[in-house]
């Protein structure tokens, strides 16, 4: 994911209702960038950091990003002339997040994330690397979007009787919560969260016909998983079990017990491995309780 991809996808997301309210009467499909600078720059800041800057163009407030001393202005095309960026002011992000701005920004961010994830899902559905090793995932999306994406759960692979058949995360075809979901919700009760409101994706996107295929499938799916995580941009990633943990940590470890419960920072992500919540695992609940108590104290 890069700036240009963000720019192209945002253009598909703009609409009149997201334009700065006092300027909405001037917005049209021939100039979709109009009135979108601030909420656009907030999103760029989310993904790439740097500063948000403010200038005045023909007496109107205009915002852009300054990243490593490089001007990034994704909405400059709303003007039919070159912009003078000399007299700028660096803006405090929190001060410009008024209720209206936050509302429009959240809508735009949600649209962007959904479109970017859909593009990745198209890669998944067209992928043939594991054709003889898996049953293709039949759902129209490989990511479950929760209430927000500050915390993302990463599982091993779709369960045989799970959402690949029920089309409902953590539930079987009879709409009954899976045993893993029951255990995980008990753990989530510790941090006062709902598993059905928490974003989730699998390390392996399709259903491996044999467990021995998990390793090669994890390798084949790694770049797709990383792209999805870049789009979601979580504050904390919780990996469920050994395979997603090995796929995400940038170092090798001998025993899963050596890393479980510790927090690691990899590519600006905080990664927290836990024991898989499946009742098959002897530490599915008791081994995870101290981990979630720690999360409760820092989250």
Where are each of the predicted segments found?
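A polyanion-binding, active-site-adjacent surface
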Residues: 117-299
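A structural boundary/capping signal
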Residues: 1-116
């Amino acid at each position: 994911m890069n700036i240009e991809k963000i720019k192209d996808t945002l253009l598909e997301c703009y609409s009149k209702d997201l334009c700065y309210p006092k300027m909405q009467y001037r917005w049209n499909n021939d100039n979709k960038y109009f009135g979108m600078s601030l909420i656009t720059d907030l999103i760029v800041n989310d993904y790439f950091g740097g500063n948000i800057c403010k200038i005045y163009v023909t007496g109107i407030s205009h915002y852009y990003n300054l990243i490593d001393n490089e001007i990034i202005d994704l909405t400059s095309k709303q003007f039919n002339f070159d912009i003078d960026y000399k007299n700028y002011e660096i803006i405090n992000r929190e001060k410009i997040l008024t209720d209206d701005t936050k509302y429009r920004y959240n809508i735009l961010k949600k649209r962007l994330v959904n479109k970017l994830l859909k593009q990745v899902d198209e890669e998944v559905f067209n992928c043939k690397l594991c054709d003889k090793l898996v049953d293709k995932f039949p759902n129209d999306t490989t990511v479950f979007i929760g209430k927000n994406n500050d915390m993302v759960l990463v599982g091993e692979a779709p369960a045989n009787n799970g959402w690949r058949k029920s089309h409902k995360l953590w539930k079987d075809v009879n709409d009954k919560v899976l045993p893993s979901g029951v255990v995980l919700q008990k753990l989530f009760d510790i941090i006062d969260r709902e598993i059905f409101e928490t974003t989730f994706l699998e390390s392996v996107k399709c259903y491996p016909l044999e467990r021995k295929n998990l390793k090669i499938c994890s390798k084949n799916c790694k770049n797709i998983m990383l792209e999805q995580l870049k789009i979601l941009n979580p504050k904390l990633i919780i990996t469920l079990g050994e395979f997603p943990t090995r796929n995400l940590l940038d170092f090798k470890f001998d025993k899963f017990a050596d890393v479980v419960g510790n927090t690691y920072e990899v590519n600006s992500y905080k990664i927290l491995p836990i024991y898989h919540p499946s009742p098959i695992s002897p530490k599915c609940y008791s081994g995870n309780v101290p981990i979630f108590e720690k999360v409760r104290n820092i989250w």
